[in-house]
Regions:
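Active-site-proximal polar cores
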Residues: 1-31
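Short, conserved turn/kink motifs that form compact alpha/beta structural patches or helix kinks used as
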Residues: 24-113
Length: 113
């Protein structure tokens, strides 16, 4: 596989509550998942569906395949988390919500957005 696209994961740097119990607003930051050109982005041209954990089927917009290494496991985006995808040819540059993910042979991560 020729990995030419980029995947970034949105993570929260802070949040929680202050000493009076008031919520502290979270600050979000984009973290590169691995390195530049670590993923491949495919469009869902056939309106295929994926079954989610809640039992519903979802017609996804894109599927992303990314290289997975041990040090990237804490960065795996969870359902509902935002990711930023960028296709190397410039046709896709979007912020999307993760609908589901799986790991493949402990070497790759497959994400539906």
């Amino acid at each position: 596989m020729n990995f030419t696209d980029t995947l970034k994961v949105q993570t929260s740097l802070s949040g929680g509550y202050d000493e009076d119990g008031n919520p502290i607003e979270s600050i979000f930051q984009w973290i590169l998942f691995g390195k530049e050109k670590n993923s491949i982005i495919f469009t869902n041209e056939k309106a295929a569906k994926v079954s989610l954990n809640d039992g519903n089927e979802y017609v996804y917009s894109y599927v992303i395949i990314a290289k997975l290494k041990k040090d990237l496991i804490p960065l795996i985006p969870r359902e509902g988390q935002k990711v930023h995808i960028h296709k190397s040819d410039g046709t896709i540059d979007k912020e999307m919500e993760v609908k589901g993910f799986v790991t493949l042979k402990n070497r790759y991560l497959k994400i539906w957005v």
